């Protein structure tokens, strides 16, 4: 945004650094669409409903900005994933990791790297066939549930899925990436 390469931005308030990014971008006035999505710290039913509402408000805000209707079919197609070959890997946990850092780790360790941070990709446990028949509220609730069911960052309070990771026979090591001043 600051370099003029993007004029639409959705940020997730995963940590204080993202809130500061939002403040800086907002102060420049260079972003035509700027939205902060609130991410809960918990993954209980109440938080899932609240998060689904936040996602729905994002959808409505973007529709109003872009004057385009939400494309449910395109949304659902974004969840199709090809079957991945199982092989040994190093997991990267912690705060977001850039592709450059992922490549550097892989080049130095000579093993596949799985980015298990919040920027690690779309590994969502949703069934596109089921979402096709849902109304919009149910679909966004299923989406919120799937997002909150991903590998939790260390900011999230429920660590059960992190504990399950250690049982993966393909996991050969973990690199925990952190930054100073994360909440």
Predicted stretch roles:
Residues 1-183:
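An N-terminal assembly and electron-transfer interface module characteristic of large anaerobic redox
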